[in-house]
Structures are given as structure tokens and as C-alpha cells.
């Protein structure tokens, strides 16, 4: 009995000694590897050059990250500002150096040379096809035109909000909208949209799926169409695909690095009437004007206040879309 107990104790002690030896050996090996690795890094670092590559997020993407400190003072020192204006403005001003003048005026407000870009567009309808909002902050000057109220409203809805879109193959599939945030957006030189709602047996409601002439025409020869149909109902869609593209889109929320300044007009376009705009708030500003020089002077004068209520390349579901009016 005594011999068995001694053997057990000796076996336990030998195991402890062996385990301790193994742990010490592993520690020395790890120290050797780590120190050698650090030595190689330190030795080679003066001879290596590396670049940190980031992800280039699209302007229409839903992955934009909010900048917490975007409202701090002097944010324009490291930011870019795009000011979009119609061709009419440059025609009326008729001065070959007017852009240089505007740049110098922006400099007095703290925007350094090279940070402000003046971009011209022909008209609202052509601008709506491809806005190209590339800057950290984008301000669009949009002159009020009573005949283009619907186009102005749709353009505002398009660029003041984030959209997640997928192409639609209308030749093969039926489509339905799931909720109020789900819209069909068409863009092109000429978009004519016709729809035929279907019942549960995929038969047309008030139309024949085999006869496009019986479809309901919801848009005719437009450049931008944001179309809303009855939710939860399949539709057969007909579109002039040769001159127009159509996408199934979901409104994600306001795009806070874009502002629209409505120039003139007795009416103010209210895009907050759309139930998908939450909360139901709009920020507006208004002044009297007669010349485009007055418009640009006002924009320069108020630019820092405008930018302070925007967010640099961000999207927030807790803030409203920004719509300004001169």
C-alpha cells in the first residue's frame, strides 16, 4: 500500500515538472518568434512604402457613415462644396470671370481656393437623369417654373433621399411594391410607363396582359419618373426600354449632404407631404431677388449656416430632408 502511494506521488511530481518544462520551452519559442518578427519589421520599415486603400462608396449607396463632428466649426477647411446652377444663370451674368469672383467671395467665408466647384446644368429635366453629386456638400440652385412643378418635386425627392435600387426585367417578371418606401424609378431621354394590375390568378384588372394598349399609362415622355402603385399587387409593366431604364427602389432615408435652394416662385414645393419622408419637417429660407448675381451673393452669405445643418456624406433616419428656398 505504501509503495502504491509513493508511486502515485512521484508520478504526479514528474508530470508537474514535465509540464513546467514544456510550458517554459513554448514560452521561449514564442518569445523567439515574436522578437524575430518585430526585429524584421523594424529593420525593413525604412525600406518599405505602403498605402492604405479605402472603400469608394457610391453616391447612391446605403453604406454611408455618419460623421459625428460634422457640425464643428471650420469643417469647410477639409471639405469640398459643389454648387449646381442652371445655364440661364451664366447666360444672364455674361461675365467670363464671374466664377473667379464667386470663388474669391467664398474665400472670405473660409472656403479655400479649390474647395468650391461651380457646376452648370442645362435644365431640370436633363439634370435629373444624372445629377452626379460628387462633393462632400452639394447645393443645387433650382429656379422655380410653374410648368415644371412635378419635375422639380420628383428631382427633389430623388436627390434629397438615399435610394437602394435594383434593375427590373419587365419582359420576364411581374413586379409589386411592398410598402410606401418602395418606388419604381425611371430615367432616360423619354420614359413612357404603362402598368396592368393583376389579380391572384395573374389576370389583368381592367386590362389585358397580352394587349399593351389596354394598360394604364402613368407617365408619358418624361425624363424622370418616380412611380407609386398599389402595394401588394402584382403589375405587368411596360416601359420604353430603348430610351429609358426602370429600377425597383427602396427609400432608405434623407441624404443629408444635399440641399436644394429654390430660386423664386410664389409657391414652395413641399416634399414632406410624402408619407415616406419622416419626420414631417422641412428647413426653408426665402429672400427676394431679381438677378442671378443676387442669388449667388445670398448663397455665399449663408453658405456656412446651410452647411452647418447638413452632414458630410451621411444619412440619418432621425433628420428631415433639407429643402431651401430663395
UniProtKB/Swiss-Prot annotation:
Major localization listed first in the record, in broad terms: virion
Glycan attachment residues as annotated in the record: 69
Residues reported in the UniProt entry to bind Ca(2+) 1: 95, 206, 214, 216
Classification via Pfam families: VP7
Signal peptide span: 1-50
GO MF, one example: metal ion binding
Misc. comment: Some rotavirus strains are neuraminidase-sensitive and require sialic acid to attach to the cell surface. Some rotavirus strains are integrin-dependent. Some rotavirus strains depend on ganglioside for their entry into the host cell. Hsp70 also seems to be involved in the entry of some strains.
Function text: Calcium-binding protein that interacts with rotavirus cell receptors once the initial attachment by VP4 has been achieved. Rotavirus attachment and entry into the host cell probably involves multiple sequential contacts between the outer capsid proteins VP4 and VP7, and the cell receptors. Following entry into the host cell, low intracellular or intravesicular Ca(2+) concentration probably causes the calcium-stabilized VP7 trimers to dissociate from the virion. This step is probably necessary for the membrane-disrupting entry step and the release of VP4, which is locked onto the virion by VP7.
Oligomer status and interactors: Homotrimer; disulfide-linked. 2 Ca(2+) ions bound at each subunit interface in the trimer hold the trimer together. Interacts with the intermediate capsid protein VP6. Interacts with the outer capsid protein VP5*.
Descriptive protein name: Outer capsid glycoprotein VP7
Amino acid at each position: 500500500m505504501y509503495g502504491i502511494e509513493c508511486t502515485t506521488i512521484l508520478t504526479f511530481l514528474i508530470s508537474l515538472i514535465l509540464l513546467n518544462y514544456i510550458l517554459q520551452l513554448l514560452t521561449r519559442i514564442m518569445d523567439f518568434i515574436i522578437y524575430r518578427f518585430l526585429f524584421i519589421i523594424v529593420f525593413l520599415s525604412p525600406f518599405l512604402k505602403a498605402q492604405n486603400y479605402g472603400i469608394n462608396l457610391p453616391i447612391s449607396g446605403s453604406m454611408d457613415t455618419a460623421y459625428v463632428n460634422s457640425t464643428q466649426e471650420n469643417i469647410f477647411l477639409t471639405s469640398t462644396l459643389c454648387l449646381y446652377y442652371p445655364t440661364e444663370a451664366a447666360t444672364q451674368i455674361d461675365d467670363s470671370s464671374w466664377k473667379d469672383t464667386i470663388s474669391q467671395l467664398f474665400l472670405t467665408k473660409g472656403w479655400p481656393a479649390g474647395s468650391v466647384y461651380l457646376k452648370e446644368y442645362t435644365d431640370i429635366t436633363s439634370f435629373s437623369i444624372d445629377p452626379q453629386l460628387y462633393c462632400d456638400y452639394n447645393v443645387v440652385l433650382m429656379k422655380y417654373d410653374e410648368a415644371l412643378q412635378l419635375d422639380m418635386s420628383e428631382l427633389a425627392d430623388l436627390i434629397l433621399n438615399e435610394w437602394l435600387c435594383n434593375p427590373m426585367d419587365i419582359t420576364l417578371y411581374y413586379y409589386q411594391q411592398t410598402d410606401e418606401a418602395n418606388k419604381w424609378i425611371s430615367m432616360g431621354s423619354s420614359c413612357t410607363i404603362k402598368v396592368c394590375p393583376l389579380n391572384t390568378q395573374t389576370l389583368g384588372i381592367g386590362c389585358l396582359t397580352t394587349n399593351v394598349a389596354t394598360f394604364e399609362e402613368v407617365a408619358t415622355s418624361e425624363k424622370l419618373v418616380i412611380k407609386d402603385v398599389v402595394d401588394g399587387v402584382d403589375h405587368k409593366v411596360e416601359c420604353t426600354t430603348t430610351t429609358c431604364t426602370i429600377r425597383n427602389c427602396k427609400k432608405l432615408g434623407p441624404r443629408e449632404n444635399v440641399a436644394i435652394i429654390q430660386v423664386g416662385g410664389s409657391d414652395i414645393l413641399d416634399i414632406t407631404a410624402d408619407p415616406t419622408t419622416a419626420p414631417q419637417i422641412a428647413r426653408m429660407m426665402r429672400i427676394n431677388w431679381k438677378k442671378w448675381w443676387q442669388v449667388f451673393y445670398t448663397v455665399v452669405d449663408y453658405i456656412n449656416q446651410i452647411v452647418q445643418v447638413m452632414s458630410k456624406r451621411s444619412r440619418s433616419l432621425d433628420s428631415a430632408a433639407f429643402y431651401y428656398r430663395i
